[in-house]
Design a protein with these regions (language model features):
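Residue-level detector of buried hydrophobic side-chain packing
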Residues: 117, 208, 234, 262-263, ...
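Acidic/glycine-enriched connector segments
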Residues: 28, 32-90, 102-108, 122, ...
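Hydrophobic, helix-prone linear segments
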Residues: 1-77, 192-193, 201, 205-211, ...
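Conserved beta-strand-loop-alpha-helix hinge of the TIR/SEFIR fold
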Residues: 19-20, 55-57, 64-124, 212-213, ...
Length: 774
């Protein structure tokens, strides 16, 4: 389709040297922060686009940055020793600075904002870089001296030194990541608000709403903690106003429309105080940015939840506000009757002191989290408001926040639209139970037939309609009485192989999860193969996919209408996700795991029975797994993928393409996300000749022959497999060029556009796919 989208308000490019490990880690942290991957609970907000650039030549990055894709292009340059020593990068940075200055001097063109980051002292040697974001500090913790080599190394001492080094490196990394994300967020708020980067930026005022009876001390602690770490200026009562000022209007205005937002310290007494409720109401009462127009917005607000011992209730206007818990004070205090000479009493004093210090540190961490999250809410509010002001309402209500009963009722009372045809909220589609709750609220307030959906779904339909001439957008997997299609998803890749495409493995994982949500909510099943990683680890791709299956499957076991609740037996027998695991990784899946995900994920183990050599058995198991997966699934989607260092006989995505072709199944091949999939697409669209990176000789250069070429997987065996792959790919190439192939190459490099093409292609391939069966 290659449908050109209108420019976004902002796009972020993180530039770093491919040899710089710390800069690469910082780039990943930028992606996680602005794509909201730190959110464990919702995961529905879309975030901001973040891309990488690690290569340059002749003063230009590769790939080149698309300045036309956003009104404001923020170029974050992670400057360290490797970049400072690279002549190509120095030349490129000079040209980028010149272009950024020209863009700011030319009204009406896309703006380029250059933000250098001081990762180490090398930036001080580059005179072309000024006003850097300083995340490096000489006071940061450093590794302890290595144990002396003059005497035989003690294993225990060496081990303790290595553990301590890792701990300090991790702590230093977290410290610098936090500095970077806060400074970047503050800088981008100034950019969105048009503040001159050379001028002294005004401090953003933040109102702290709290109950004086049990929240004043915590509110003061938060206020005092702000000064050391941010450019926010907090205030919360008449003591922060000049003498003689009536506090009513400033405090109401503070809750409703201060430049920086509001923090609600929700203690046990907070819901019982009329003034607190009034402040919450003011902050969360929607208002139109443009009178008689749109969008509807609310004050950026976060909540600090202080759990006490009193029964209490919630506050309705704060139902959809992001919140974090305040650290509890569970100190082991010594008995007041203990004698100071008593050793046990002294020990208790020490423990109490240590716990008090730890509590103080946890409070500091919480305050930092509150500052960072509020800054992010302010930035997202500014970005979203700019984005939707270009949209045509056309009978819609467009919201800049996730709605709840309070906000929807207020919009209705203000007479925005007696009966809108549609209500749009920001971000990705809500989880199925949340969406059903929202559907019920909207029906009760605005009447039956008013559709409520995410802006992502709206954008997907708009892209599909513009690109495919489809007048109805993207349908769900369709008509009753037919089968439900299982879609095989195959992706992956290593950072170093994906960086040339301007992305990393985190982008691939993000696309995998977003695509999974869309497919599940549109009545498709999904399947994926490979290792499940460690199921007991809280953060990994597998758990993200299973979370998507639980939250976004269309046949949720949660339904507000009892007569529509699905048969629980069918839910167990037809789980939305299927995982194919090849030997020996399938041995990691225990009965406990299978029971834990019963009705959600079916685990298929694949183990060749007639093979004795373990190395050959591993390779054969992967081939057999991919063959079975191709046979069981109706279509396969390929993107990313390892080029070198894969497991099995052949590159994983290449073998998956071959097995799906052999099974006569259609394949959607995404070329815009790098990796093996991009090489395969390049080959099929080109003039012939397999890419060198997919040859046996090139793979051998990236391997330890002693590990890769073993008795069960000998050189002759592997060369034979490669020759077979080449012959098969040549056959696919011929079919692709004579128009008989079932390979569909999708060239979109933008996630939303790629998903739109995928969904539109699936609806054409399977126009009568529907729930029930496979």
């Amino acid at each position: 389709m290659n449908q050109k989208q209108p420019p976004l308000p902002v796009c972020i490019y993180a530039l770093f040297h491919p040899k710089a490990k710390e800069s690469a880690a910082l780039a990943r942290s930028i992606f996680r922060w602005f794509r909201l991957k730190e959110d464990a609970e919702q995961g529905t907000t879309a975030g901001l686009p973040v891309y990488y650039r690690t290569q340059c030549k002749d003063g230009v990055t590769s790939p080149e940055m698309d300045w036309s894709g956003a009104k404001h292009n923020v170029v974050v340059v992670l400057v360290d020793d490797e970049m400072a020593l690279d002549e190509d990068w120095r030349r490129t940075l000079g040209k980028l600075i010149e272009r950024a200055e020209r863009s700011r001097a030319t009204p009406g063109v896309e703006q380029i904002h250059f933000l250098p980051v001081m990762v180490d002292k090398s930036l001080e040697r580059l005179s072309i870089l000024s006003q850097p974001i300083r995340i490096y500090s000489q006071t940061d913790p450093i590794e302890p001296p290595r144990p002396s080599t003059a005497i035989p190394a003690d294993a225990a001492v060496q081990g303790a030194w290595e553990v301590e080094c890792k701990r300090i490196q991790a702590a230093r990394g977290r410290l610098r990541e936090r500095r970077l994300r806060r400074s970047l967020t503050e800088s981008m708020i100034r950019i969105m608000r048009g503040i001159d980067p050379k001028a002294l930026p005004p401090r953003l005022k933040v109102f702290i709403s709290h109950a004086k009876t049990d929240g004043a001390a915590i509110a003061a602690r938060i206020r005092d903690g702000f000064a050391a770490i941010s450019q926010l200026e907090p205030w919360f009562d008449q003591n922060d106003l000049p003498p003689g000022f009536d506090p009513f209007e400033p405090m109401v205005d503070g809750a409703r429309s201060t430049s920086g937002g509001m923090i609600a310290v929700v203690t046990d007494r907070y819901p019982t105080r009329p003034w607190c409720r009034y402040e919450a109401m003011q902050a969360r009462t929607p208002r139109e940015l443009i009178e008689g127009g749109m969008p509807w917005t609310v004050q950026p607000t976060v909540a600090v939840l202080v759990a006490g011992s009193t029964w209490t209730r919630t506050v309705a206007p704060l139902a959809q506000v992001h919140r974090i818990g305040w650290p509890s004070a569970s100190l082991a205090r010594p008995s007041p009757d203990a004698h100071r000479s008593d050793v046990a009493a002294a020990a208790r004093d020490w423990i109490a002191l240590d716990e008090a210090l730890q509590l103080r540190l946890r409070e500091d961490e919480c305050i930092a989290d509150v500052v960072d999250r509020l800054l992010l809410e302010i930035l997202f509010s500014d970005v979203f408001n700019r984005y939707v002001q270009r949209m045509n309402p056309d009978g819609r209500i467009i919201l800049g926040f996730i709605p709840d009963g309070w906000t929807l009722a207020n919009i209705k009372l203000k007479g925005a639209a007696s009966r809108p045809r549609e209500i749009l909220y920001p971000g990705h589609r809500l989880r199925t139970p949340e969406q059903k709750e929202l559907d019920t609220l909207v029906s009760g307030i605005f009447g039956e037939g008013v559709r409520v959906r995410s802006l992502e779904d709206h954008a997907l339909d708009a892209l599909a309609t513009a690109g495919a001439g489809d007048t109805g957008g993207i349908p769900n997997a369709g008509a009753a009485g037919t089968v439900r299609v299982r879609v095989a998803l195959s992706a992956g890749g290593t950072d170093s192989e994906l960086w040339p495409a301007g992305i990393g493995s985190c982008h691939i994982d993000d696309l995998m999860v977003r695509l999974t949500r869309q497919l599940l909510s549109r009545n498709y099943y999904i399947a994926y193969g490979g290792t499940l990683a460690e199921l007991d680890q809280p953060k990994n791709l597998t758990m993200s996919l299973l979370d998507a299956a639980e939250g976004w499957r269309s046949t949720s076991d949660f339904d507000l209408e009892p007569d529509r609740q699905p048969d629980p037996v069918n839910l167990i027998n037809a789980p939305p996700v299927r995982n194919y695991a090849a030997w020996p990784n399938d041995q990691k899946i225990t009965s406990s795991h299978r029971a834990q995900f019963l009705g959600l994920c079916e685990f298929i183990s694949v183990e060749p029975q007639a093979v004795m050599d373990p190395d050959r058995k591993k390779a054969d198991a992967l081939t057999e797994m991919r063959t079975k997966m191709a046979s069981d699934c109706g279509v396969r989607i390929l993107f990313g993928g390892k080029i070198h260092g894969w497991s099995g006989w052949l590159p994983g995505l290449a073998e998956e393409l071959l097995t799906s072709h052999e099974a006569g199944k259609p394949v959607l091949l995404l070329s815009g996300f790098g990796g093996c999939a991009a090489l395969l697409a390049e080959y099929l669209k080109g003039a012939g000749g397999l890419p060198l990176a997919l040859s046996f000789s090139d793979e051998l250069k990236h391997r330890d022959p002693g590990e890769w070429l073993k008795p069960g997987t000998s050189r002759q065996d592997r060369q034979t497999k490669y020759q077979s792959m080449t012959t098969h790919l040549e056959r696919i190439y011929a079919e692709y060029h004579d128009g008989t192939s079932r390979i569909h190459i999708i060239d979109e490099a933008n996630e939303t556009a790629a998903i739109a093409v995928i969904l539109a292609t699936l609806s054409r391939l399977f126009p009568r796919a529907a729930p029930g069966g496979e």
